[in-house]
C-alpha cells in the first residue's frame, strides 16, 4: 500500500510539473506581447463609470480567443450610468465552472513615475471637473494577467474540462461594479460559477512572489457623512451661538473611543475622520461643519455596532451641548459605496497554495496578514459564502526598491500613490502562471 501511495504521489507531482512547465513555456513566449499590452493599458486609463474603451479592448481580445463575449453587463442604481462590465464564456465540455475576474477602472491621480509609458490622460469626472487619471492601484497589471490567463487556457483546452467565465468589472474603486453586474443577472444570464478567483497587485511584495491569506483578507468599507448643524454668529460673541466647530471637535474625539473602548481588541476595526470642512473667516462662527469618515471592519456584527455607535454618539454629544432637536446632526451612511469584507474560503485557499508552490516554488508563496483595505470582489461569494472564492496578492515591487526600503527606511510608493510603478515583466509572468495554474487545477 505504501509503495502504491508513493507511486500515485509521484504521478501527481509529475502531472503537476508537466502542467507547470507547459504554462511556463507558453508564458515565456507570450510575455513580450503581454508587456506591450500592459504599457498600452497603463498609458490609457479610464475613471470608474467611464471604462468604455478599456472594456472594448478586453472584449476584442477575448473574442479573438474564441470566447462568447457580452458587453455592457451591469445595472447601477443610477439609471443614467452605463455599465461597461463584460463577460466572456469559453465552454470546453463537462466539468466545473470557474470565474476569473479583473477590474477595469483607474483613479483620479496625476502620475509622477516618470516612466516612458506614464499616463498623460485627462478626464471629466462626475462633478464636471478636469482631472488627471492613472492606474495607481494595479488594475493594469490585473487586466494584463487576466488576458494572459485567457490566452493560456484557450491554447491549452486539451488540459482542462468545464466552463471558463472571465469577467471585466467596472467601478471597483467606487464599490459599485460587482453589485451592478450581479443585479444584471451575472449568475443567471451566464453560467453560475463553482469557484471565483481574482488577484490584486501588492505594493509591499517583490515582483515574482504570491501572497495568500485564508479567511478574512480585506475589510468592510463604509463611508459616513456627518453634518453638524449649529447657529453661527460673530466670533467675538460665541455665547450667542451654537458653535458647530467646537461640537465637531468633540465628536471627532468621541469617535476615537468606539474602537478602543467598545470593540474587542481581537476584532480589527478602524474609524477615521478623513475630512473636516467648516467656516469661511477668522471671526465668523459658521452654521454647519461637515465631517467625512471611513469605517473599516470584518465581522457584520462589528460593522453594525460601529455604525450604530457613530450615530448615537454624535446625536448624544449634540444633545448634551444643548443643541436643539431641530438642529440635530445628520448622520448618513453611503450604502451605494459600501463594500463588504472579502473572505477567502480556507479550503480553496489551501488548495491554491499547493498549486502555486508547484508552479512557482515554495519560496515564492508567502502567507500575508489581512488588511483593512476594501475590495468589492467579496460580493461574488453571495450571502452565506455560497460560492468558494479566493483573491490572492501579486507581488509588484521592484526587489531593488524593496531592499533599499529595508536597509534605509526609504518609503515605498503605496497603492493609490502617484509614484506606484509595478515591475511589469516578473509581475505579469507570475500573475499569468499563478492564475492559469489555479484554473487548470480546478478544472483538471
Q: For each predicted feature, which ranges?
A:
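Sec-dependent signal peptide recognition
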Residues: 3-10
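Hydrophobic h-region of N-terminal signal peptides that target proteins for export
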Residues: 11-20, 30
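Acidic/His- and Gly-rich active-site-bordering loop/insert found
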Residues: 21-135, 140, 144-148, 152-162
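Soluble non-cytosolic domains of exported or imported proteins
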Residues: 28-32, 45-56, 140, 144, ...
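Divalent metal-coordination and catalytic microenvironments
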Residues: 41, 88, 100, 139, ...
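Histidine/acidic-residue-rich, glycine-tolerant segments that coordinate divalent metal ions
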Residues: 85-87, 122-134, 140-141, 152-275, ...
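Metal-dependent amide/peptide-bond hydrolase catalytic core
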Residues: 246-444
Amino acid at each position: 500500500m505504501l509503495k502504491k501511495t508513493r507511486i500515485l504521489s509521484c504521478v501527481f507531482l509529475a502531472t503537476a510539473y508537466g502542467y507547470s512547465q507547459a504554462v511556463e513555456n507558453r508564458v515565456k513566449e507570450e510575455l513580450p506581447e503581454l508587456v506591450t499590452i500592459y504599457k498600452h493599458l497603463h498609458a490609457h486609463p479610464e475613471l470608474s463609470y467611464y471604462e468604455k474603451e478599456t472594456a472594448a479592448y478586453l472584449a476584442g481580445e477575448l473574442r479573438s480567443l474564441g470566447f462568447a463575449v457580452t458587453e455592457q453587463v451591469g445595472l447601477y442604481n443610477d439609471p443614467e450610468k452605463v455599465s461597461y462590465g463584460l463577460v466572456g464564456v469559453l465552454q470546453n465540455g463537462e466539468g466545473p465552472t470557474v470565474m476569473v475576474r479583473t477590474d477595469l477602472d483607474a483613479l483620479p491621480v496625476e502620475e509622477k513615475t516618470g516612466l516612458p509609458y506614464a499616463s498623460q490622460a485627462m478626464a471629466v469626472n462626475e462633478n464636471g471637473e478636469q482631472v488627471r487619471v492613472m492606474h495607481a492601484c494595479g488594475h493594469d497589471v490585473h487586466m494584463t494577467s487576466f488576458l494572459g490567463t485567457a490566452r493560456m487556457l484557450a491554447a491549452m483546452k486539451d488540459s482542462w474540462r468545464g466552463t471558463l467565465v472571465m469577467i471585466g468589472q467596472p467601478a471597483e474603486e467606487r464599490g459599485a461594479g460587482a453589485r451592478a453586474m450581479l443585479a444584471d443577472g451575472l449568475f443567471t444570464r451566464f453560467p453560475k460559477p463553482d469557484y471565483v478567483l481574482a488577484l490584486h497587485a501588492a505594493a509591499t511584495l517583490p515582483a515574482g512572489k504570491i501572497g495568500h491569506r485564508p479567511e478574512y483578507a480585506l475589510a468592510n468599507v463604509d463611508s459616513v457623512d456627518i453634518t453638524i448643524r449649529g447657529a453661527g454668529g460673530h466670533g467675538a460673541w460665541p455665547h450667542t451661538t451654537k458653535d458647530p466647530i467646537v461640537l465637531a471637535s468633540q465628536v471627532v474625539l468621541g469617535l476615537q473611543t468606539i474602537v478602543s473602548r467598545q470593540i474587542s481588541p481581537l476584532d480589527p476595526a478602524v474609524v477615521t475622520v478623513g475630512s473636516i470642512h467648516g467656516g469661511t473667516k477668522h471671526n465668523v462662527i459658521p452654521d454647519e461643519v461637515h465631517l467625512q469618515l471611513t469605517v473599516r471592519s470584518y465581522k457584520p456584527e462589528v460593522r453594525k455596532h460601529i455604525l450604530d455607535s457613530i450615530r448615537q454618539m454624535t446625536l448624544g454629544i449634540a444633545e448634551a451641548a444643548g443643541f436643539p432637536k431641530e438642529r440635530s446632526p445628520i448622520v448618513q451612511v453611503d450604502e451605494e459605496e459600501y463594500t463588504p469584507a472579502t473572505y477567502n474560503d480556507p479550503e480553496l485557499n489551501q488548495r491554491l497554495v499547493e498549486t502555486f508552490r508547484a508552479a512557482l516554488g515554495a519560496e515564492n508563496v508567502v502567507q500575508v496578514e489581512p488588511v483593512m483595505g476594501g475590495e468589492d470582489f467579496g460580493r461574488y461569494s453571495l450571502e452565506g459564502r455560497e460560492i468558494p472564492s479566493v483573491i490572492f496578492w501579486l507581488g509588484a515591487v521592484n526587489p531593488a526598491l524593496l531592499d533599499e526600503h529595508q536597509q534605509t527606511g526609504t518609503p515605498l510608493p503605496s497603492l493609490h500613490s502617484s509614484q506606484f510603478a509595478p515591475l511589469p515583466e516578473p509581475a505579469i509572468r507570475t500573475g499569468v502562471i499563478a492564475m492559469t495554474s489555479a484554473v487548470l487545477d480546478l478544472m483538471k
